[in-house]
Amino acid sequence: SAFKNLEKAGNPWGVDPSTRADWAEGLGIPSMADGPGEVEYLFWVGCAGSFDDRNRKVVRATAELLAAAGVRIAILGPEETCTGDFARRAGNEYLFQTLAAQNVETLNRYGVRRIVTACPHCFNTLRNEYPQLGGRYEVVHHSELLARLLAEGRLRLEPGSSLSVAFHDSCYLGRHNGVYDAPRDALRAAPGLELVEMPRSRENGFCCGAGGARMWMEERIGTKVCDDRTAEAAATGAGVVAVACPFCLTMLADAAADGGREETLAVRDVAQILADRLSRGPREG
């Protein structure tokens, strides 16, 4: 089960934790254990970014954007373990406390002050739940940092083909933490991109179906929430649904494929959309 995997391997899939940094191959990102010197941010990769093929592309795109902006980052690599978000949402408080204590000890040992992450679930846990356990850090979501870098001119994008994009609000980024403008500002900064809104957006946004640990449950009756949401996105006429959460990416991309919309409705993270405009030619994913 996912709980057993968390206990044994520190991630819900039960993947060997020694492979946590494999996604970063060739990018030259130092780990904290390497003694990287002064870094602006610790990049908290999260379980999905580390082990899920789709989301590995997202964290690579994020790292490439930060490198292009001259932001020095480091990772924990195999020393990172699940934040425990899923365990707490699913009612296993003991497992949450165990995982959280391990992470807080690691982060504090390295003197980490600032963290950036592309996962709103990790973001919410690190920012709002770790302080009670002795982990006090400045935590930003990658969309917030990217929007700031674009506004400051540290990150420059080239014009790309015209694209109509509908942005999907992640529950943990939006309603739980009030981050609505940053991902939209980042997308608007991309030349040739038109941002459209779905009827249910911002404070009235609609869950992708993965929240509250439902990512790890099987749907049994009724219409899947993710199917409803992709239909809503398709109705806007947009060619791309932009997301800012690994679970939203998984749920909506699967729903688009299951609903026969794979050719007409791409589901991509904000970082992937921006990274496409870093240089000529599309990137992976």
Locate the predicted segments by residue.
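Iron-sulfur-cluster electron-transfer modules
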Residues: 1-118, 123-130
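A short, charged/proline- and glycine-enriched loop
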Residues: 36-41, 159-165
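Local cysteine-cluster metal-coordination motifs and their immediate loop/turn environment
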Residues: 45-50, 79-90, 116-125, 166-177, ...
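Active-site glycine- and acidic-residue-rich loops that bind
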Residues: 51-58, 149, 172-189
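Short helix-loop-beta junction
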Residues: 60-73, 180-194
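Short, flexible loop segments at boundaries between secondary-structure elements
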Residues: 133-162, 200-203, 257-285
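Long, compositionally biased charged/polar accessory segments in the mid-to-C-terminal portions
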Residues: 193-199, 217-226
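A short, acidic, amphipathic alpha-helical segment used as a generic capping/interface helix at domain edges
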Residues: 221-239
